[in-house]
Each structure stands twice: as structure tokens, then as C-alpha cells.
């Protein structure tokens, strides 16, 4: 919830709290609201936040509507409206939002990579929400799933229409490959822009019976590598 309490009494507005250049602030702002809308729970937003208002709220003045003359603010307002439409038209984002079976973490363990991903599930639908909170891109980042699937991009916060940094043609349809870790036998590989987020609609497919074997072999190979490196380190210390 980002209410009026967050934008008064010297606390600065939401966009003005954020680090970086003008463009970096806008990128973070898009990802912040992506997180709010894609995470379970009801949404609360205070007027002005939806266009990246820089001046704190003043009950004696109207909003600075002139901001919409500037491309970043105009694009962000359009992004916010689109984000709201996505939320209202994708049942998995609101159906069963307090049911733990409708939410599943996919990536949340590596603070150094700064990538967080989770599944939202509802009414037979599966959506994969992905955030890159770092100021650099990740190329071919692996996400491990329990089922094989195709993936279609629904929303990308770095799309040019929202003022994002992505340029040219890009791949918006993805597919899992066999092999994974931690009992998740399938891998979805994706390019993640700096401080960007994306929403993918998943289409599950029939499981490959060889996928579990491939994952087990990869896990065993990793254990052997760790064992060899540990043994080498032990010998070198003698």
C-alpha cells in the first residue's frame, strides 16, 4: 500500500525516494508497481503516484498536471493504466490471493543476483512474475520450474512504449528445456533488463519422462565438482 502517508511531511514522493538518474528512477518506479500488482493482496495507491509526481502532496494545491507534457511521465501514466488492466483481466492475480496453493516462489535465494520470481495460479491459469532489482542486465538467466511449458510475454516494464530501454525486435515467446535443479526438472531461460520486470503467461505441456533423470545427473555432476574442489583445497592447505 502506497498511501498519502508515503508522500507527505518531508518523506518525498515515491519517485523522488528512488536512487539514480531520471531514467533509472522511472525504471525502478515501474518495477516497484509491478511488484505491488503482481504480489498477493489488495492494492492501494495515492493520487499523483500514477504519473510519477515529484512534489509532495499538498491539500491546498491540485496535482502538477503539466508533468504529463514530459515523455517519461506521460509514458508512466500509460504504463500504470495498462498494469491496472492486466491485473483486472488476469484471474490468477486476484483469485485465491490468500490461498497459499495459489502462490509459489521460483527464485528468491540469491541476493547478489537480485532476481525474484514467483508463480501466481488461479482458475487453471499460471503466470510467472519476474523482477530484476539490479542496475545491470542478466543474459540467459535460468529459472527452474516443476513442469514443461511455453511462455508468452504479457507485460515488460522496459518496453519502449512505457519509456523503457529495450530496443528493436526481441523474443516474446519462450519454451522450457529439460533439466533443472532442486526437484524442478525444467529450465526457462530469459534475458532480464536492468531494473526491469516481466510477466509471462505459461502454457503447461505433458511432462518429459527423461527430465527427472537429466536433473538428477546434473545434480550428481555438481556434487562431484564440489567434492573435487573441496578435496583440492584440503590438499593444498597441507
Language model regions located:
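Aromatic-lined glycan-binding groove of carbohydrate-active enzymes
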Residues: 1-16, 39
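Carbohydrate-interacting/catalytic domains
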Residues: 22-26, 30, 35-45, 49-238
